[in-house]
From Swiss-Prot:
GO terms for cellular component: plasma membrane; proton-transporting ATP synthase complex. Disulfide bonds: none annotated. One of its GO terms (molecular function) is proton-transporting ATP synthase activity, rotational mechanism. It is a peripheral membrane protein. F-type ATPases have 2 components, F(1) - the catalytic core - and F(0) - the membrane proton channel. F(1) has five subunits: alpha(3), beta(3), gamma(1), delta(1), epsilon(1). F(0) has three main subunits: a(1), b(2) and c(10-14). The alpha and beta chains form an alternating ring which encloses part of the gamma chain. F(1) is attached to F(0) by a central stalk formed by the gamma and epsilon chains, while a peripheral stalk is formed by the delta and b chains. Belongs to the ATPase delta chain family. PANTHER family: ATP SYNTHASE DELTA CHAIN. The gene is atpH. It comes from Rickettsia conorii (strain ATCC VR-613 / Malish 7). The keyword Cell membrane applies. It comes from the Bacteria. This is ATP synthase subunit delta. It is found in: Cell inner membrane.
């Protein structure tokens, strides 16, 4: 099984368990919080991701962590499953996949908008309304900054990429000039 399918399968299983008790958002908050703790703490991350550390020690650590921060049984059991199957290293990917599935279950599309500079709230609202009108769907927009695009924006969702950046336009011109054998 490829890694993408594996990640999605874990995310689907977690979401399905959360749906039984209608606590999908709570589970997302918990799993995101746990992921942040692991990501931000080098020692915890190395301990849980290390193939050398005994699984029983990892299980004890997860149980202790769950007790200290009071997470749900669903999340605790999910983390224990990841430990038992040696899959803790893909937790961040699973959290991202869970988030995507959660929004899909609410019929909300996640869209990433990349700009060269921080956009003002009015600009963000305008972009959001234009994207929602184009997609005819409610969206959750993730605004990111990448100053290498020089100006404009790049819009990403699903497998779509709409490049309205200056860098993208320059790349297209460069490619067109190469096709007609003009040195760039």
């Amino acid at each position: 099984m490829n890694k993408g399918n594996l990640i999605k399968n874990y995310a689907v299983a977690l979401l399905n368990n959360a749906m039984v008790d209608n606590i999908q958002d709570k589970i997302f908050e918990e799993i995101t919080s746990i992921n942040r703790i692991i990501t931000d703490n080098f020692d915890i991350r190395e301990f849980l991701f290390s193939p050398i550390v005994n699984k029983n020690d990892k299980i004890n650590a997860v149980n202790s962590l769950a007790k200290n921060i009071k997470i749900s049984t669903i999340v605790q059991n999910f983390l224990l499953l990841l430990v038992k199957n040696s899959r803790t290293a893909i937790l961040s990917n699973i959290v991202d996949a869970y988030n995507t599935l959660l929004y899909e279950s609410k019929n909300i599309k996640i869209v990433q908008v990349i700009s060269a500079n921080k956009l003002q709230p009015k600009e963000q609202e305008w972009i959001k309304s234009r994207i929602e009108k184009e997609l005819n769907q409610t969206t959750e927009i993730l605004f990111d900054i990448d100053n290498t695009i020089i100006g404009g924006i790049i819009i990403k969702y699903d497998s779509m990429l709409q490049d309205y950046s200056i860098k993208g336009s320059l790349e297209k011109i460069k490619k067109a000039l190469k096709i007609v054998n003009i040195a760039v």
